[in-house]
Swiss-Prot record:
HAMAP family: Glycogen_synth. It catalyses: [(1->4)-alpha-D-glucosyl](n) + ADP-alpha-D-glucose = [(1->4)-alpha-D-glucosyl](n+1) + ADP + H(+). Pathway: Glycan biosynthesis; glycogen biosynthesis. Signal peptide: none annotated. This is Glycogen synthase. The lineage of its organism: Bacteria, Pseudomonadati, Pseudomonadota, Gammaproteobacteria, Vibrionales. Pfam families: Glyco_transf_5 (PF08323), Glycos_transf_1 (PF00534). It comes from Vibrio vulnificus (strain YJ016).
Length: 485
């Protein structure tokens, strides 16, 4: 019985291959794909944003309405993403807009209502299309109401008698807090009388609604699961996560090696494998190509890379105070990112002063992001917090040793050289200071300068680490089965 295939509906606000703004989209594609590889029936549900290419041409499999909702009419469209069926919930009132969440850096004022509708429609459609999942897997605040609705409304329907809910926490900073007046669209939001509803006297917090009602909860790394039980790590929801501690686990995200592997990466001028000769030739060629592309002197020098959003979370505020001192060393640094205008202005000032050593590319470019990973000897991720992180995993695959702060998924995936050289895959610091980052960068540079043979050994060892999605998917299956017991 334990080996019976499971049926799963993976509910998310975005999915790579259709529409994407962040890492959630990568998980929404890769995890269902891996579940199908393990012989489970995994289907995806997302809103039918008009920004999705050719969404108007998708097959309509359901034309219906949602009772008690002001804008009741919706359609379910269907397409495939690889072997995964995708259900697209179409409602022009909510999703016929230029982008997913915001315009001109202003969030849509009805985002709470939009994603409440989407959550309700995902459950409402299931009996109508005849798909009876064992598990409904919600993700972040956008679908936090799915476990709430399943428990308090749809749970009374015999169709859902055996269906359990999972909530994945990708980033608890974003909670989906909306005024109660905005959430009157369905009777079930009159939930002041529901003891575990995430409602204050004036507001509903959609992520709390999910946390308090999901059958099981997972964070996207084991360390992040522990951090969520603290005020600092949960950003104000420690009590809720402590209450659900027995149902909270951490599962490290996998890596999509079909998109991120130096042997097959079409963005690279030279592909390379995890052998010393191939790696050295490939990384040297990629370093030269990066130097030429961004206008740095072409020379054999320790290359540091960083690709990130310019935000407090990504730790740019740790780099800036020591950047000038660091650039006095024999190094080059390429930083690619957009975001906070104040951080960007400071980076531009340093780049103007150290043009022979530091280039700041204020734009995201996928080709350049891949090339930086391959060309770098070391990759900077000094994050304030990092639920999982993927660039450190990409870096290891490309033989670029990550320099990380020991938080969240960074702590779970990177082994520090000074702690155990034999199993090291990078460099780790813990103290949240610029000086701690500088010392760690200097440690890395010392290895490059004094023992290049040892550096190559560590790089090869890092390249051989395996963070494939099938491993993570097996852990999710265990979580699903525990919810069904």
């Amino acid at each position: 019985m334990a080996t019976n295939p499971l049926s799963i509906l993976f509910v998310a606000s975005e999915v790579e291959g259709l529409i994407k703004s962040g890492g959630l989209a990568d998980v929404a594609k890769a995890l269902p794909e891996a579940l199908v590889n393990l012989q489970h029936d995994a289907r995806i549900a997302i809103p039918a944003y008009t920004a999705i290419p050719n969404v108007c041409d998708d097959e309509v499999i359901l034309d219906t309405h949602l009772e008690t909702w002001p804008h009741t009419h919706y359609q379910v469209k269907k397409r495939f993403l690889g072997d995964n069926p995708v259900y697209l919930i179409a409602c022009g009132h909510y999703f016929d807009r230029p982008s997913m969440y915001a315009e001109n850096n202003q969030a849509y004022t009805d985002n709470g209502e939009r994603f409440a509708f989407f959550s309700a429609a995902c459950l409402d459609m299931l009996p109508k299309i005849g798909f009876q999942p064992d598990i409904v897997h919600a993700n972040d605040w956008h679908t936090g109401l799915v476990p709430f609705l399943l428990k308090h409304r749809y749970g009374q329907d015999p169709f859902f008698a055996q269906t359990k809910s999972i909530l994945s926490i990708h980033n608890a900073v974003f909670k989906g807090v909306f005024h109660y007046d905005e959430m009157q669209c369905l009777p079930e939001f009159h939930c002041r009388n529901v003891p575990d509803a995430a409602v204050s006297s004036t507001h509903m917090t959609m992520l709390k609604a999910g946390v308090m009602n999901a059958d099981k909860i997972n964070a996207v790394s084991p360390t992040y699961a522990e951090e969520l039980k603290t005020e600092l790590g949960s950003h104000g929801m420690a009590w809720e996560f402590q209450q659900r501690a027995g149902d909270l686990v951490g599962i490290l995200n996998g890596c999509d090696y079909s998109a991120w592997h130096p042997d097959t990466d079409s963005y690279l001028p030279i592909n390379y494998k995890a052998t010393k000769q191939s790696m050295v030739r490939g990384k040297n060629g990629c370093k030269r190509a990066l130097q030429e592309q961004v206008g740095l002197p072409v020379k054999d020098v320790a290359m540091f890379g960083m690709v990130c959003r310019l935000t407090h979370q990504k730790g740019v505020h740790y780099l800036l105070p020591v950047l000038t001192e660091f650039l006095k060393l024999d190094v080059q640094l390429v930083l690619v990112g957009t975001g906070d205008p104040l951080l960007a202005a400071q980076l531009r000032d340093v780049a103007a002063q150290f043009g022979e050593k530091f280039v700041f590319v204020e734009a995201y470019n996928n080709q350049l992001a891949h090339l930086v990973e391959a060309a770098s000897d070391f990759f900077l991720m000094p994050s304030e917090f990092e639920p999982c992180g993927l660039n450190q995993i990409y870096s290891m695959a490309y033989g670029s040793l990550p320099i990380v702060r020991g938080v969240g998924g960074l702590k779970d995936s990177v082994c520090d050289y000074d702690v155990n050289p034999e199993t090291a895959t990078g460099f780790v610091f813990y103290e949240p200071t610029a000086q701690a980052l500088l010392i760690t960068m200097q440690r890395a540079l010392l290895l490059y300068a004094q023992n290049l043979t040892e550096l190559r050994r560590v790089q090869l060892y890092a390249m051989e680490r395996d963070f494939c999605w099938n491993k993570a998917a097996e852990q999710y299956v265990e979580l699903y089965r525990s919810a069904l017991k």
